[in-house]
């Protein structure tokens, strides 16, 4: 319950908390291991319209711009299929999960709206999720931020694949 300005107050004992803002029809925002003490004022948060899609198993098709995907188990792009991830998409991997691409992966980020592959953990650490394995032909990876994985891209036979402006951040190894 909020006041007329949308503010509210709640009493909690001092400690470390997962703080999460959610509203139906909007992408949630989380802060993990956030220290709350007496009279803590939290930052203002603006939730962006959109939905979070949980994925697991075989995937293909188009993941539209600005959406968020939670990878709950290993995902696979089957041979002969294509997964196209448009600019501004965030893909959050649960611990120990990853992607195997036997088909084609197109990551279509751009200068102003990159694609993000990251950990789903509220306080991410290197090695939180596995990696992306490429075995299909003609993958196209553009303007991707790839963070907190165990490894960078692995695989073989990814003939004709291109990588342009891929930023590896906070991974255990390349």
Residue positions per predicted region:
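Surface-exposed loop/edge segments in extracytoplasmic proteins
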Residues: 1, 27-32
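Extracellular beta-sheet/turn segments enriched in Thr/Pro/Gly and aliphatic residues
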Residues: 33-52
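Beta-strand-rich interaction surfaces with strong enrichment in secreted/lumenal proteins
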Residues: 31-35, 72-75
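Short, acidic Ser/Thr/Gly-rich low-complexity loop/linker segments typical of extracellular
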Residues: 1-11
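A short, solvent-exposed beta-strand micro-motif common in secreted/extracellular proteins
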Residues: 14-25
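Hydrophobic loop/turn residues within beta-sheet-rich immunoglobulin-like superfamily modules
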Residues: 11-15, 34
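Beta-strand/loop edge motif enriched in small/polar residues
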Residues: 4, 48-174
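Short strand-edge motifs at loop-to-beta-strand transitions and within beta-strands
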Residues: 8-10, 29, 41-43
């Amino acid at each position: 319950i909020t006041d007329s300005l949308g503010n509210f107050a709640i009493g909690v004992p001092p400690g470390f908390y997962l703080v999460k803002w959610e509203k139906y029809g909007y992408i949630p925002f989380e802060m993990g291991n956030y220290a709350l003490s007496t009279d803590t004022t939290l930052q203002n948060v603006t939730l962006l319209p959109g939905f979070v899609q949980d994925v697991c198993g075989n995937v293909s098709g188009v993941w539209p711009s600005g959406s968020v995907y939670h990878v709950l188990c290993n995902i696979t792009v089957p041979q002969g299929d294509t997964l196209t991830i448009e600019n501004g998409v965030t893909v959050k991997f649960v611990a120990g999960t990853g992607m195997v691409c036997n088909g084609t992966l197109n990551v279509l980020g751009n200068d102003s709206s990159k694609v993000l592959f990251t950990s789903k953990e509220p306080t991410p650490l290197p090695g939180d999720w596995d990696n992306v394995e490429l075995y299909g032909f003609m993958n196209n990876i553009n303007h991707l931020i790839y963070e907190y994985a165990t490894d960078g891209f692995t695989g073989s036979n990814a003939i004709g694949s291109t990588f342009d402006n891929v930023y590896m951040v906070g991974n255990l190894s390349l």
